[in-house]
């Protein structure tokens, strides 16, 4: 009877050793550091302009042919035919102006795996397609090359965001793409929704992009470290030696 019991446990241990329990995860590749020289986003805007232009229309300083807070052509404060978060022609998402309710688009589904992985760092932002809102940071002290701009930044830094929007790092191949997406959505959200059309100048936009870029780099580093730690823990507890040890302890307790 004892030999049969021991033989069963040996069979279980043998199967556990040859089970493929390794965890295969795609890990983000490390990117470059802050201020490594030159633009890391080729094709993003004209020389001397901002590095994070929207996908269509004018630049951050003059969207849709209009100035900040100007109704002609649609400014950030008074967009043409509907505000931020509303389609052209008025109405909220799913209403589409004169469209009927049956034509309402389906709501985006948030990937709960990504939400759970980043729950400690921020909360999911409703209406932004699964973006997370990072924790508040101290605005970095940045030098812009001349005393006039440095003084302007110190006097107006409170107008710039101190939190960034981002997605889980496992959705990106490297730091550059994470930071690019993070800067775009954060600046857009801040200039359109948070400040409700505050009249930002081109200098404000340039400084805001620099500030947000550095905060996005910091956010990426935090998320990458947490991501690797979670992955290492899962791999450790799913490795064959650990399973063997746990099985042996169970054998001693049961036997």
Swiss-Prot record:
Lipid attachment site numbers (GPI-anchor amidated alanine): 232
Associated disorder: PrP is found in high quantity in the brain of humans and animals infected with the degenerative neurological diseases kuru, Creutzfeldt-Jakob disease (CJD), Gerstmann-Straussler syndrome (GSS), scrapie, bovine spongiform encephalopathy (BSE), transmissible mink encephalopathy (TME), etc.
Sequence repeats: 54-62, 63-70, 71-78, 79-86, 87-94
Protein name per its UniProtKB record: Major prion protein
Job of this protein: Its primary physiological function is unclear. May play a role in neuronal development and synaptic plasticity. May be required for neuronal myelin sheath maintenance. May promote myelin homeostasis through acting as an agonist for ADGRG6 receptor. May play a role in iron uptake and iron homeostasis. Soluble oligomers are toxic to cultured neuroblastoma cells and induce apoptosis (in vitro). Association with GPC1 (via its heparan sulfate chains) targets PRNP to lipid rafts. Also provides Cu(2+) or Zn(2+) for the ascorbate-mediated GPC1 deaminase degradation of its heparan sulfate side chains.
Record-linked PANTHER family: DOPPEL PRION, MAJOR PRION PROTEIN
Bias-annotated ranges (Gly residues): 55-97
Domain of life the protein comes from: Eukaryota
GO cellular component terms given for this protein: Golgi apparatus; plasma membrane; side of membrane
Signal sequence bounds: 1-24
UniProt source species: Canis lupus familiaris
Residues of the propeptide: 233-255
Region called Interaction with GRB2, ERI3 and SYN1, residue ranges: 25-232
Membrane topology: Lipid-anchor; GPI-anchor
Pfam families attached to this UniProt entry: Prion, Prion_bPrPp, Prion_octapep
Subcellular location: Cell membrane; Golgi apparatus
Lineage per the UniProt record: Eukaryota, Metazoa, Chordata, Craniata, Vertebrata
One of the record's GO molecular function terms: copper ion binding
